[in-house]
Amino acid sequence: MSLLTEVETYVLSIVPSGPLKAEIAQRLEDVFAGKNTDLEALMEWLKTRPILSPLTKGILGFVFTLTVPSERGLQRRRFVQNALNGNGDPNNMDRAVKLYRKLKREITFHGAKEIALSYSAGALASCMGLIYNRMGAVTTEVAFGLVCATCEQIADSQHRSHRQMVTTTNPLIRHENRMVLASTTAKAMEQMAGSSEQAAEAMEVASQARQMVQAMRAIGTHPSSSAGLKDDLLENLQAYQKRMGVQMQRFK
């Protein structure tokens, strides 16, 4: 796996799924391929994206700044600086300075990532902030190692949180989660179906499923009523899958 592929993988792992994730992936690919060289426009685009947390925007801004060639005097962006200040916690800043001194002696991506993984996400973000604000300089490889370590820490906590939700025994949370998944699946199928004539059946099934979820939420239903909702939806679309050759199993 190449260095840039690895960076792209780690960065995308902390971006929520959805159309915006596909857009960001495309931007990263363009930047890494040298196709997008307007850092100013890129940062303006990033700043106005919805859904993304300030920290995710800060990390993406840091990656874009590292990768896109720019004039020396180009001003640093406030939204990135604010995201990479370690929540203003002096402890994070102290640890970030110690980490920076270690990284300065490092020259490889994997070496930097290994060192950085023993620090908290707050300290890692602060260290990125030091480099972003030109208070310290490390090689691009080392900076990317720092980025990937930060993303790994964030993705780990997201995974723990997700696992807790999936394994929860609370029937209300499980009920809502099943309805959200069914609704999301229906939406994705509507998007994939597009405007072809054969897609009418799939669109109809997906639309009915979404209406059903809305009705269940509006009137309040027993937590067990959503059991198998998404699977039923997928089974109804098997005929469409065979005709269109679309791999609907991926949604399971």
Curated annotation (Swiss-Prot):
Q: Motif Nuclear localization signal in this chain: where?
A: 101-105
- Cellular localisation: Virion membrane; Host nucleus
BP GO terms, sorted: viral budding from plasma membrane
- Could you tell me which residues belong to the region RNP-binding? 165-252
Q: How does it sit in the membrane?
A: Peripheral membrane protein
> Which terms does the record give in the GO molecular function aspect?
RNA binding; structural constituent of virion
Task: Extract the Pfam families matched here.
Answer: Flu_M1 (PF00598), Flu_M1_C (PF08289)
Q: What is the effect of changing D232N?
A: In strain: Isolate MA20 and Isolate MA20a
Single GO cellular component annotation? host cell nucleus
- Main role? Plays critical roles in virus replication, from virus entry and uncoating to assembly and budding of the virus particle. M1 binding to ribonucleocapsids (RNPs) in nucleus seems to inhibit viral transcription. Interaction of viral NEP with M1-RNP is thought to promote nuclear export of the complex, which is targeted to the virion assembly site at the apical plasma membrane in polarized epithelial cells. Interactions with NA and HA may bring M1, a non-raft-associated protein, into lipid rafts. Forms a continuous shell on the inner side of the lipid bilayer in virion, where it binds the RNP.
Protein family (similarity comment): Belongs to the influenza viruses Matrix protein M1 family.
Quote the subunit structure annotation. Answer: Homodimer and homomultimer. Interacts with NEP. Binds ribonucleocapsid by both interacting with genomic RNA and NP protein. May interact with HA and NA. Cannot bind NP without genomic RNA.
Q: What is this protein called?
A: Matrix protein 1
Q: Which organism is it from?
A: Influenza A virus (strain A/Hong Kong/1/1968 H3N2)
